[in-house]
């Protein structure tokens, strides 16, 4: 990372080497100086008594992006480099809540599509709960007559299902998915009730 420095103040940067941006910054100060296409090995590059291009060293403390953000950079210009210091500040409480609700929604979706089990014809079978698979269960159930039979392949075995058998799979999947959404609602209510960063971070979302 690099920065254009003018009278010990940063004009442009920190950024990757960008000859066009750097020359533009110099020209706005009335300085014409042909810069190389790629970053020079020897830095700082002194342009004149006012301007130079320096390597940037960033100092970023550990930060939790769900509830905090970086403030800065606050510059410290040394002989060798421009030091970009960042401070960690708390995000507004509404931003914290929004971010944690996004985490909860993703966690709910991950649970939602994991699948569940049901006992059909005295056998425990896995019910696929991803959104495509559960639509197939429901559509087939709606199309079946009461007397129809259907051969169904579960991960564990093949079963010949009656409409009543298939309803057990549909009900198991629907109840499992509802439980996932109820879990997310509970987490969302806890988030809304929290008033501080510490209270928000005490909520267990992902185990």
Give the positions of each predicted feature.
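A preference for well-ordered globular domain cores
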Residues: 1, 5-207
């Amino acid at each position: 990372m690099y920065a254009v420095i003018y009278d010990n103040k940063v004009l442009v940067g920190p950024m990757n080497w960008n000859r066009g941006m750097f020359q533009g910054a110099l020209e706005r100060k009335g300085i014409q100086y042909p810069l190389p296409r790629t970053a020079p090995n020897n830095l700082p590059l002194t342009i004149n008594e006012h301007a130079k291009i320096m390597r940037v060293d960033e100092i970023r403390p550990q930060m939790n992006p769900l509830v905090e953000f970086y403030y800065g950079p606050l510059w410290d210009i040394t002989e060798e480099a421009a030091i970009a210091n960042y401070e960690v500040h708390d995000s507004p409480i509404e931003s914290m809540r929004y971010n944690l609700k996004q985490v909860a929604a993703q966690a709910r979706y991950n649970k939602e599509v994991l699948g569940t089990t049901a006992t059909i014809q005295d056998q425990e079978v896995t019910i696929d709960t991803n959104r495509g698979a559960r639509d197939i269960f429901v559509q087939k159930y709606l199309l079946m007559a009461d007397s129809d039979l259907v051969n169904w392949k579960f991960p564990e075995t093949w079963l010949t299902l009656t409409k009543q058998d298939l309803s057990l799979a549909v009900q198991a999947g629907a109840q499992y998915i509802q439980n996932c959404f109820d879990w997310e609602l509970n987490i969302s209510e806890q988030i809304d009730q929290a008033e501080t960063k510490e209270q928000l971070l005490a909520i267990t979302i992902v185990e």
